Every structure is written in C-alpha cells, then in structure tokens.
Amino acid sequence: MVRKKNPPLRNIASEGEAQITESAASKREDTISSKEISTDPMQENSEQSGLVEHNSDDHSFHDQEPSSSINKDSASLSLSERAVVNYSHLKGRNVYFSPMEVTDRNMLALVTTDTRSACDPLKSPIKSEADDTQELASSASVDSLEAKEENDMSPRATDFTVQCGKVDCQSSSPASVASDNLHVPSDGIAGLNKSQAVLLVNDNSDSAPLSPELQDFKCNICGYGYYGNDPTDLIKHFRKYHLGLHNRTRQDVELDTKILALHNMVQFSQSKDFQKMNRSVLSGVLQDFNSPRPVLLNGTYDVQVTFGETFIGIGRKTPDCQGNTKYFRCKFCNFTYLAKSATELEQHFLKTHPNKMKMSSDSGKPSEKSTNKSSPIPRSCEPGDLGKWQDKITVKAADDIPVGYSVPIKPVDSCRQNGTDDTNYYWCKFCSFSCESSSNSKLLEHHSKQHGGGKSESPNSDLNDEIFRGSVINQNEITKSSDEQLPTKIDKGLAKKKDVSSVPTEDIIVTNYNCQFCDFRYSKSHGPEVILVGPLLRHYQQHHNIHKCTIKHCPFCPRGLCTPEKHLGEITYPFACKKSNCSHCALLLLHLSSGGTESTRVKHQCDQCSFSSPDVDVLLLHYENAHEAQACEIKQELNHQHGADGQPSIKEIKEHSCTKCDFIVQVEEDLPRHYRRVHNCYKCRQCNFTAADTQSLLDHFNSAHCQEFEITTSNGGEHHGTSSIKEEPKTDLKVYNLVTPDSKMGEAIFDSTVKKEKLEDKETLREKAWSDGSVDDLRGVAWRAPDILRTSPSYSQMGLGLLTTVSVNQDQQKSSRDSPNVEAAHLARPVYGLSIEPKGFQGVTAGASGEKSGQHTPQYPTAGDSKSKDESQSLLRRRRGSGVFCANCLTTKTSLWRKNANGGYVCNACGLYQKLHSTPRPLNIIKQNNGEQIIRRRTRKRLNPEALQPEQLTKHQRASSEEQANGSPLDIRSEDHSMEGHQRENQQLSMNKYGSQASLTKSHSAQQTMIVSQTMDIHKRMQPLHIQIKSPQESSGEPGNSSSVSDGKGSSERGSPIEKYMRPIKHPNYSPPGSPIEKYQYPLFGLPFVHNDFQSEADWLRFWSKYKLSVPGNPHYLSHVPGLPNPCPNYVPYPTFNLPAQYSSVGSDNDIPLDLAMKHSRPGSGTNGDSKEKSKSPVSVKDDGPLNVTKIEKSDKSTQDELSTKCVHCGIVFLDEVMYALHMSCHGESGPFQCSICQHLCTDKYDFTTHIQRGLHRNIAQAEKNGKNKD
C-alpha cells in the first residue's frame, strides 16, 4: 500500500442511514482517550502500518486478526466498492483511495454496501482527529450536532470507532456505543452490525465531499484568523508564534492534531475553566469538560447569548480580553460591556427590549444562556410550563416605588402555570443584582442597603422604570381575562402578539414609542382597547416645552378614531409643535374635548395606574394631578441630559437612533449611512426629514435650512428679506434676466424659460451634489435687499471665493448672453452644492454696450442657480478642463483635476505634490519653457510668441477666452453659427462689442477687455512671476486678446501674453515665496513680482489710496485717473505706473489674478466699449483684491526662508516693504482677519485671503448701486 508522508486533514463520511452520534467535543475526547490507550502515540503517528492485511504486531493499535477480518469484510463487499475522496490539506488537492487500501495515517478504508451503513473509512484515533479537524469548525452541523447526543454515553464512548481493531480496547472504552445493536467482539470489528450506521467523524453527509467547506479559522490566543478551507496556516501560526516551533516535521502530526482540536473544541474555546493554553495542554493533558455547553458558536467563535429562545446578543473574545472575559453586545442596540458572563446583557434585554422576547409554546427544553454560572433562568418541562414573560411582576417597596422585577421559575416536574410555591427569579431595577428566592425579601433588603431605601441613585432610574413597566403593564388583567396564560411570539419589533394556544384570548399589542427630538423611547404592551401613549406625550410636554394642547401623537387618537392596527410597530408621532405657547390651544382643546367621546374605540390608559380616558388632554391632566410628584422627579433627572432650555444638547446626546427601526449608534456619521444602506433613503442631518434620493434631500435642505445659514452668515450685508420671498415650484423653471438689452436692469424676464439639461447631466449632478457643494463653501453667501428686489443674489466672499467656475450648456449659454440665468426654484436661498459658472460672466457680453454699467453683480453666477443646471454643467465643463483653473498654479490644462484640503480644484501635478509633501507646489519646481509650463505644452503645442501670426494669435486667444470665460461669444458663434436668430443676435452684439474694442484699446472699456483677455491668458499659461512685457506694441494689442480675438483684431499687435513675463529683468533666483499663486493673488499689494524698477513707492501708495477710495464701488474707480496710468482704472493687480498707459495696462491686465480673469472673461462683454461704468463695474468686481489674498494664503505654506518681510497673520513673505505695507493695510483693526475695506470679519487667513481675492465687498457695493439704479 502507498504510505503518505504527511497525513492530510480530510473529511470522513459514512453513507446510508448514517446516524450522528458524535459532536466535535466527543471527537476531541476520542483523541484524549486514544492518548490514554496508546502506549506509544508517537510511534503510532509515524509508523502505523499502511495495509490492513499486513501484520501489525509492531503497532499497539491493530491486531492481525481484526485486520484480516476487516480485509475480508471489505473484500466480500468489493462489488460496490467506490473511491473514497479525501482532501489533503498539505497538498491542496483531492486524493483518491481504493476502498481496499488503508494508509497508516489516513484511514482504514472499510466499504460496506450492506444497506450502505457500515463505516466507510476507519482511521486511527490520532489520525482521524488530524484529518477531520480541518472540517471540524466548518461543518455546518457542528454546533447543532454537539447538542444531540441521544444516548447517555461517556465522552469516550465513540473511541470504539477508531480503536475497533484493538482487542483490549474494551477495557478502556465503555461497552455501550452510539447504537444499541453495535457491539465490540473480542476479535475486533468482525461482529460489527452492518445494519447500523456509525458516524466516525463530524460529517453526516452520505459521501465525502470533494472539497472542504470554507470556514473561518481563528487563533484563540491572539485572534489571528482567515477565511478558507485549509487549516495549515493556522497550525503554522500557532506553532511559530505561540509554541516557538519554527520547523515543521513529520513527527508533529499529533501536535498539529491537538492544535486543531483545541481550536475547534467548543469546551476549550468557551469554557470558563479554560483560562489559558499551555504546552502541557497541547501535549495531550487535556481536561475533560462534561458540563453542557451553555453557548453556541458561529464561524468566528463568538458566544451567542440566548434568553429563553431569543437570541439577544453575542460575546466576543478579543485580544484585549483577559482570562475568560468577553465583550458582550446587545443584538438590538449598541449596549456593550466587558465581563465574564452575560447576566448583565440579559437584564439589559429584559429592561430595554422586552417586546423582542420570543416564547415558543412547543419548546420542551430549558433555555440556554451564555453564562457558565447557574444563574436562574426560566425552566420548563412541558409546553407552556416555561416562566412566561407575562408572568413578570414588578416588585415595589413599601413606598410604592418599583425596586425590581421577578419572573417565576417553574420546576422541571411542575406543570402548573402559576404555582405559589415556585421559586422566582428576582433582579434589581437599578443594578445587576439578581437572586433566586421564594419571596422578594432579598431584593427589598438589597434595595434598602444599596439604593438608599427607595431613592434611586441612577439619574434615569424612574425613566427606566417607566420604560420597563410598559412591558408588563396590564399583565395581571390579561392573565385574568384569559383561561390559560400562553406564550406569545413577537416577530422582530412588530407590535402585535397573538396567543398560540387553541384557547381564544384577546390580542396583546406591543408598541414602541420614540421621541422625535431626543433618544427617549419605550415599549408598551397593552390590550386592543387601550393605548399607552401617555408617557410619550408627557415627555414631550415636560422635556421639550411642548404645550400639551399642541400634542397630536396620532391624527386619530385624539378623537378616539384609532384602532390597534394603526399602532402596530413604532409610534414616531407626535408631529408636535415646538412653541411654548400656541395660539391654537383653546380651539384645539375645545375641538378635542367635544369630539373625543363621539366615536370612542380606543382609550388612553395611564401607565402608572388603571385610569384611562379617550381624550389625550384628560389623560395629561390626570398625570398632572395624580402623578405630578413622580413626573417632576423624572423631569429633573432627564434634564441632566438636555440643555438648560429643555432642548437636547447636540454635544451631550451620546446615542443617535433611527426613526425607522431600533438601530442606535453613538457616532452621528454612522446614522446617515444606516439610512442609506438599510432603508435606501437619505436623512437630513438638520432634522428628521428623509428623502428617497439626493435631489429631494438637497431640495429640502435648500428650502428648509438655507434660511438658517443665511441668518448666521454675515458679510457686512443685510440678510433680511430672505424669508419674505416665496420659493416657486421647482417645476416652473423661470429665468430672471439681470441685464436686458433694453437696459432695464432690475426687471425679471419670466417669458424665457431655460431648457432642461440633459438627463445624464442631471444624473451626474445628483451624484456630485454633496461633494461639490458643501455648506462651508457657501458659508458667506447671503441675499441683500436690493438683490432680492432685482431677483439677483449678492455674493459674499465665500460664495464666490471657494467655488470654481463652471461652464454651461450651449442652450443655457444662448440665454446667458442676454442675461445670467437664475432658476426661480431656489431664487430665495443659496443653493448648496452649486459651483460658480463663467456663464455668469458671459451674460454680460450679450447685452448692449450701454447696459454694462450696472451689470457688475450679475456677472457672477448666482448661488441660487438651479443645482441641476449649474452643477451638472460645471461637472461636465470641469471634466473637459474648461472653465476651471488650478487654485495653486492657475493652469487650466491638466489630465486630472484634484481637490485640495480646502475643497478647491487643483491640477494633477499640484494635487499630487501637496498630497505627498503637505505643502503647495512651489513655483521654482514648475518646469517651464519660455515661461510656460511643460505640462501644458503636452496639451497644446505653441509657437514662439513672437513668431505667432496675427491669425494664429487670434485663434489661440479665442481658445483661451473660451476656456477662461466659459466660451467667448465669438467661439460660441463659431460653434453655433447655425443657431436660431436670437442666438445670432447675441453673437452679433458680442461681435460688435469686440469689434469696437480694437478702437477702444486705450479707453477704459478697452482696458477692461485687456484685463479679461490677459487674465485669461495668464490663467492658461500660469506665467512665471517675473512680470515682463516685451513691448508696448505687443501689450497694446492685448486688450482685445479675449474679445478682439474674436474678430482677429489687436491680437497680432501684442503677440503672446507670455512675453511680458519672458523679459530677463528678474534674477534667476527671484521667485515668489512659495506657491506661484502669489504672483496673481495680490492685485495691488502683497505681490512680490512687481518690482521697484517698474514704479516708485510713491506711485504705489497713490495707487493704493485710489484703490481704497474706490472700494465702495465708486464710479470713478475704473475711470482714468490723471495721476495714475491706465492700469489703475482697470484695477489691474500689478499696475506698472511708470510705463506708458498702453504698456502698463497690458501688464496689469495680464497680472490680473486668474480668478478675476475668469470672472472677467465675461467682462469681454463688459468691454463692449460701452459706458465706463460698465467696464468699471465688471472690472471692480473682477479686480477686487480677492484674487491676491486667495493665492497668498497658499503661498504661505511654502514661503522661502530667504524672504524677509512676512505677514504674521497670513504667513506670506513679501520681497519688499512696500508690498508688505500694502498687504498689511488690508488687515482691519478689530481683528487679524478683518477686512479694512468693508470691515467684514473673516474666520481665518484662508477666509480672509478669499475675501480679498474675490473682492466681494466690491460686489456688494456695486450691487447696492445697481439696485438703486434699477429702482
């Protein structure tokens, strides 16, 4: 015969009428007994004979006679021989054995076809253990089989099966075996009764499975585990890390077998007496645990705690558990504790989840508990003898205060339902004390000693009593009314209980009541004619200051129209008013009292006494009169959990409960996930509102909670009037025109409707609604009175500063040329989740040139824009890389957009750098070629700026304006040249605008155009910090860059806007402190790259004073100032005062922060060559110092050490003192982050930077002015 060097761990199965007589425990006991019998176990392990017919005199386990008998028996039955499949855990494959061959380590192949009941494989005691332990824990029937030892047999009774070949095994094994017909003759197994099937191992299948079942293998010592079908890794782990045996040898088979036996043996892993595994245990000195196993095991070796027949929780052994302690956790809530027994879990279950109790009438076995103590539990001998849940009695002290509860324990031989001589199980209501006694004297004595003679030390003791009492209320009445008390079954929180006996009785209803404002909850069992909602109503009245007359816990109950069916499950009412006084109280009282008795079907019963009333108000009055003292106590105790105003404090509430089920969690973030996964809905974090999808949730949030945020946010503007605007139906998508061609600034166009975006856009929007639009992003968005009148929102710093620009659909772009679009649905409130879209800027381009002056505010997209439009479009545009720029390097070209820590979009390079180094990507590491990032060169090839032909420049500038301005009118025109006449008109207007720009190059409108185009170019190129302009001619052409590019004019004059940075005026080591953003961030101050070579400090100071004077939206702000060059009127971030007007304006335009440039991309329209005011307004909005600050902050992180002047508040380092002084002048006196221009208090340096960069104070001022003009 073939002998296997390493015995596989395999499954052994018997066929036919296989009768399970062993459990995993008894199997392990086989190992114990075999160890005792074996004279030389190691010899047996390694040297057992492989053939039954061979002489086995050398081995102590097999006589030649039994071997021959076995051989004969198997030979006579060879007609039906079949291959026995065994799984080798060592080789990971199935090994087929002939039924005639027996291996020394694997099995004795005994195939009997007579009734297919004889033992197929027999194996030696040790080997059988080794082979089967692999499957021991995974067998699906292990847990259930362990409890099914039908015959009273000793743990070693089954040793016969594996030691049948030994003559003298009878002396060490009991004669009684699993089958009465099975006996052991002296010659071995020759007399084996083939009509009886004996299962030798823990597998009850008819044939050996082809492969072991997947199971959890877990180390009982350290918790190491894995999921699979091979225990080899577990054995290796245990040997190496717990035994120090690093080399595996063939002689360790016995040790491996014992390791697996210990890990799979329930007694060892769960017994209280099994404190620690040691080497002696592993060597075979195993204790014999005969005590019945009190707990069940699942695949992870958790203790399953049951009470009666109800599975109430688990006990888990974790690495931090010492000794026999475990973490016990309630199945129905988050209650968890560390202890050795589950007594406290049972008491918790009785108090908190009485309605989850399951009692089966046909249960004839005592309930299993998960503690090894003989703690009293209900016992029964006959169906119906079990201590009934309804028999639970509240034990009260002399002063009528509940001190505990008791459940009668029926003797095993007693079938009486309520025997007076029965022992009762008592437990204290305030602690874990419990006892068995025939009277309540012990409980009362304990209460008087430990709990002050009736005064509860627990702050919520009365509440707990109130909660628990509901589960036993009216039990005496129910018992009297029924002929026989029968167990009831509650099906997972459903409130209705029905008797399972043939004796008819009234329905028992159990209802769960939950408070909508806190974690107060309780369960009440009651009859069909009463409802025990009083405690909930009283709770609302006392702890939430809800007037009793406004309490409507059910729309039917106040008038007595409700039925028990209406109260099945959980009561989440009332929809109670939170007002402390209600003007409707008197009428409500009259209404309820008058109609309460007309059709009374259900009464409201007091949970403290037998009083009942069909009227809720009468019941509450009864509580006040009869139970006022106790109510006051409860209120006082509960107030510890609530704020001083009676409302629950968010910080103090430790548990958060689901309103749809019993789920309770301590981490608030886990609750929305629970709603999403379990109930397939979305819950508002501000209230209990749940929505079927994110769209509905966002709509609810915008309509219900945005108002609160508006009130709390202040940006120096007025927030009143928000609530006065009605929110129009969302289906009615009306467009409000902020600037009409007729120069009617404030009129809303209700005729034109916006086409709905594509379905896929909306889907994308819904997916990204919450990620893109956070509450913080629009923290500063607020409505101002003038804006409300004009139906246009005013944006505060955060509204625009933290949101990225987005593009629009062409359909919307068409309408946006006439005016920015605002959906009426969210007009009254800021819509969270929307991003700023360049379309807001583009709306300016469409209008006539004379209409631009008051259009400043409208240029920005409104926060109230429809989420589904704006955000979906923003996402689409962002995907294409258009309309979005990197918040760090200002590039618009990247293979992947990322988000930084502040939620802003950054390019892939900057995002990866900041992720790796936790600091913004500095400028000096950005590879450039002629001032352009190489990264962007991959996206588009550019010629030498000087070599570019006018046509090429026009085309390139057109593309840049399209990206930055979200599509310039010219580009849109080229794309949509076949659009309707209305679109053509808009395009023509924009063309005229741009056409006129060439002639207005030196005018303010032209300057504004220059700003827009240059900023757009800057946006695209992210130029080096060195501000260098090639020549005035080139710069002069720049004004028309974005707009005149449309016409192809002026762009050729200037060449590439990059050139201004290409001049080698700065030293090679000259670089902004940190992030390249800085060069764009501070238009007037804080930008180190405007060197003193270009202008004197006096010019800077004069410019700064002019800047401050023009802050409130001064109309002269953008006008040409005699003392300053054109850059000042344009409010270019880095004006070069000493240069020619044309030259300086160009340079300043290009220096404009990208953010402004993007917003000014609309200014292209503003530059239509219309009135100066027009150009002023857009410019001022765009030029607002905001850009400067935003980027400065980022640079703060990567400032360079060699720079000397640093802002202590923002951490920004400046190259010269003048820039530093300009920056510091932005800080107000009231705080380090107060804006000195509009006195707005920013929360931190990032908020301050964004505020200054975006220049929202200018927006507000201009908006006010526009509003006045409209009026």
From Swiss-Prot:
Keywords: DNA-binding, Isopeptide bond, Metal-binding, Nucleus, Repeat, Repressor, Transcription, Transcription regulation, Ubl conjugation, Zinc, Zinc-finger. GO terms for cellular component: nucleus. Sumoylated. Sumoylation in the repressor domain inhibits the transcription repression activity. Sumoylation on Lys-1191 is the major site. Appears to be sumoylated on multiple sites. InterPro entries: TRPS1, Znf_C2H2_sf, Znf_C2H2_type, Znf_GATA, Znf_NHR/GATA. GO terms for biological process: regulation of transcription by RNA polymerase II. Its main location: nucleus. It is found in: Nucleus. Residues 34-49, 66-76 have a biased composition (Polar residues). A zinc finger (GATA-type) spans 886-910. This is Zinc finger transcription factor Trps1. It comes from Xenopus laevis. The gene is trps1.
